[in-house]
Amino acid sequence: MAELTISAADIEGAIEDYVSSFSADTEREEIGTVIDAGDGIAHVEGLPSVMTQELLEFPGGVLGVALNLDEHSVGAVILGEFEKIEEGQQVKRTGEVLSVPVGDAFLGRVVNPLGQPIDGQGDIAAETRRALELQAPSVVQRQSVSEPLQTGIKAIDAMTPIGRGQRQLIIGDRKTGKTAVCVDTILNQREAWLTGDPKQQVRCVYVAIGQKGTTIASVKRALEEGGAMEYTTIVAAPASDAAGFKWLAPYTGSAIGQHWMYNGKHVLIVFDDLSKQADAYRAISLLLRRPPGREAFPGDVFYLHSRLLERCAKLSDELGGGSMTGLPIIETKANDISAFIPTNVISITDGQCFLESDLFNQGVRPAINVGVSVSRVGGAAQIKAMKEVAGSLRLDLSQYRELEAFAAFASDLDAASKAQLDRGARLVELLKQPQYSPLAVEEQVVAIFLGTQGHLDSVPVEDVQRFESELLEHVKASHSDIFDGIRETKKLSEEAEEKLVSVINEFKKGFQASDGSSVVVSENAEALDPEDLEKESVKVRKPAPKKA
């Protein structure tokens, strides 16, 4: 039998290997306990090192976000099924803040506020992840708005133009066409998408907050039928979701859009609507016992929206020149735009389009109130051709509304007043536009030219829309060089204007009004004299007293 020998060197080597591989580090894990839970909120004790906005893991893989950091407990918003969370259950820290997957694979998909697909089309291969609470671009990282974002809606592109990187508020009562305006804007980006040019393409994100499931489905169907889903992502937080999801949904959509913006691409994001996000945040704050302020909203509700909308920007060329344009929607009550949330968002954004229920009920759609609507920075992005033809449009419509109210009580009017009323009625009719039928900017320029230069004065009001559509078809079929020139040069040259006037007059000769009469060709049609308008506005403000 062989003798077993152990050398001292072997023993020494084994000990050295063990010592070198030994680690005295221990993992320290904080575990909290649920004190109470309900209505999507849980209070947890025993997590002294937790960070604000940190993700917490509840039993069953349910996640929560730490919002309130009190001395002895943590108030968390539950993201998921909170019904199964009970008192006494253990809660673990994750050491992470909330983030969502992002990338081009999200185009054409419907996701929830956690970035998980809910359209039944399988998993999404994300390129990377992006934190929801991301700092907005600083002043030196931005540049001024200079490129137009065409909505395809005549009233907006002519009077309240939107530029890439702008925040334009869409505000109005319920059922006034706010969502329709935004969906039309998304549909209008299709031509730019088909060019394949990254400098022209616009990727769209539609964030549905607190909407009915049927409403979200109808928007998705409209986008699919218009061929717009291939460049659109829908982030859905329907009314049936917990308040936490409605609060997070806009930040999720913003994170998805910012990924493209920082890669030098252009993004359009629609928040439909931020009133419901504010309501959800109010519910969360009250359940967390935060002190209420005006209309029971918490003190930081302004910051809730400002830090979201400030992420929309036109980045500097050093950062790629990408942009994210925001169209937040706010719902008013009884056309009151002086309420708390509307005034907050108006002060944050770069302009607003106010949709009025009275105009909507009169059949003026889109029901844009010209007097209250404004675009503070979009004018710099408007193409020169539109500036030239639509320069007097806002003034003409405002004076028409003023004179219309006065004319209702006046028995007789002079010729200048009647001419202004007739012109205004035709302009109102001209700016009406059916839903889901956006117009290219060159078609809009020709249409607005018809109204502001007096070429519709001899057309009966009830035939204005038919005259416009048939003329545009005629120009497209027989004189497409007019459209091509406007599209390529962004201007309406003198030669093109002269040709357009002759085309309009020729078209009038063959146009039959609905009553069978022919339209008078006015060779010298022109805009109303500004001096006459000024005199009329003075007369309106100071009408002569009637004789007894």
Curated annotation (Swiss-Prot):
SUPFAM superfamilies recorded: C-terminal domain of alpha and beta subunits of F1 ATP synthase, N-terminal domain of alpha and beta subunits of F1 ATP synthase, P-loop containing nucleoside triphosphate hydrolases
Subcellular location: Cell membrane
GO cellular component: plasma membrane; proton-transporting ATP synthase complex
Major localization class: membrane
UniProt catalytic activity: ATP + H2O + 4 H(+)(in) = ADP + phosphate + 5 H(+)(out)
EC number: 7.1.2.2
Bilayer disposition of the protein: Peripheral membrane protein
Keywords: ATP synthesis, ATP-binding, Cell membrane, CF(1), Hydrogen ion transport, Ion transport, Membrane, Nucleotide-binding, Translocase, Transport
Function: Produces ATP from ADP in the presence of a proton gradient across the membrane. The alpha chain is a regulatory subunit.
HAMAP family documented for this protein: ATP_synth_alpha_bact
Family: Belongs to the ATPase alpha/beta chains family.
Protein name from the UniProt record: ATP synthase subunit alpha
Organism phylogeny: Bacteria, Bacillati, Actinomycetota, Actinomycetes, Mycobacteriales
